Amino acid sequence: MQHSTRKLNMIESQLRPNNIIDENLIAAFEKVQQEDFLPDSFQNLSYIDDHIKFSKSSFILKPLIFAKFLNIIKPEMLDVILEVGSGGGYTTSVLANLVNSVYSIEQDKDIYDLTIKNIKKNKIINVNVLFSNYRQLNILELKFNKIVINGTVNADPLNLLDKLNINGKLICILKEKSSSNIYLFNKKINGYEKLKIMNASSPILINYIDKEEFNF
């Protein structure tokens, strides 16, 4: 099956039937060729209804979950967005079609290098890709309107919430004792508001509880 057919099937059978109907959002997905961001050995997995795993901690979220994230936070053109977990640059590029400025951080050196190569190859100019441990973020001094964590965390992402502007939004999957759900965090003057949205699952991206390796 051709990649263009796979993409059409993804939009018409994964996104639209699940209430992803914002035409700007659909258009952002239509403009990006996922196969351009996959290593050769992963080409046959383009647009599948599942996560595409490069390694234990590096992956591309399944299209529906990423689309749900964007449908919830509603990116606007003037937003400066932080993406955590670049996944080779595919989700980064979808975001780049929706807002003026995207910062993407990646802690796996191989995937960071792949993302840099893919962003340059596809001539995307409104993206900055940074190599950083997700739990430290020492290189980031900016504050953001919105933050997208492309995977699951196992505790409230306090270090990332600190990077939000007041009234900013953070979206992620939070693993709790007996369930895993999409949560929306809204930054307030005194702390943050935490809203459970819906059940969802993905691999762990940020492990706040156990010691975590930083892959140079």
Give the residues covered by each predicted segment.
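Catalytic, metal-anchored helix/loop core of enzyme active sites in primary metabolism
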Residues: 216
